[in-house]
UniProtKB/Swiss-Prot annotation:
Annotated region described as Disordered, given as residue ranges: 1-29
Family membership: Belongs to the Mrp/NBP35 ATP-binding proteins family. NUBP1/NBP35 subfamily.
Protein's organism: Aedes aegypti
PROSITE patterns according to UniProt: MRP (PS01215)
Keywords of the record: 4Fe-4S, ATP-binding, Cytoplasm, Iron, Iron-sulfur, Metal-binding, Nucleotide-binding
Annotated residues for binding of ATP: 70-77
Compositionally biased residues, Basic and acidic residues: 1-15
UniProt protein name: Cytosolic Fe-S cluster assembly factor Nubp1 homolog
GO biological process: iron-sulfur cluster assembly
Cross-referenced InterPro entries: Mrp-like_CS, Mrp/NBP35_ATP-bd, NUBP1/Nbp35, P-loop_NTPase, YlxH/NBP35
Amino acid sequence: MSAPEVENKPADAPEHCPGTESENAGKASACAGCPNQQICATGPKGPDPSIALVKEKLKEVRNKILVLSGKGGVGKSTVTALLSRAMAQLNPERNYGVLDVDICGPSQPRVLGVLGEQVHQSGSGWSPVYVEDNLSLMSIGFLLGSPDDAIIWRGPKKNGMIRQFLTEVDWGQLDYLVLDTPPGTSDEHLSATTFLKETDGNWGAVLVTTPQEVALLDVRKEITFCKKMGIPVVGVVENMSVFVCPKCTTESDIFPAKTGGAEKMCEEMEVAYLGKLPLDPRLAKCCDEGKDFITEHSKSPTVIALHQIVAKVQDFFD
């Protein structure tokens, strides 16, 4: 039998944390090396104070979307950028934000075309970088001296960075905050989930996969993670589903779905299937160059499919 979940523990706590309200807080063997050990051992017992700070900071954010993937390389960051750009363009009267919590591999500054921009600080906190008038971005990529700098951090330091993003970035009023996460179910996911589940407004997860079974195996685990953590699943996007020839429009399966693909998996796991995004080589080029694929190639089958997916995502929240 697995150990029960401890609810009252900091987001950056070790795996077997006894909880801040326990008599063993700061004294148990699991507490060794935890950045909160001294506070827990000497301070009053109670919930993580950061949770209240995050709730206050995000009180004007109506909807939060976690973009997840079980495996790397399925296009999760690309889908995050496409989803955010499309919603911002379709709803110019609304405000959108992207938070890149892939601490070790921040790619949103390049994908969204704002690589090299600087984050400014004011009395109300860090100001996110604006991609469009109604689309802003915050990423650790803006805080590095060079895009080639490596982030070599253990879990507690990553979690501290995410806490700082959620408590110190001045997002203002947002209709949607989209979080780009690393692959799998790691410290970043646990930290973001612990904070977001206590905030006001709606939240949910969009999962990204490719058709082949090796990717579907991991996205099944991601769905199980969402159910265990109480994260509403908005649905699954099947990325790179087919290749549509730009000359003759013939469809080819680059990654054959041997077991029925994402749609069949969604039926088995009882989650929504949002749709499939065809593979378009021009999209990869736009991501590398930080260009807006949606406006540059508006007639692409990928853009047409994207708008259908966006409609389903917005229906879930609205």
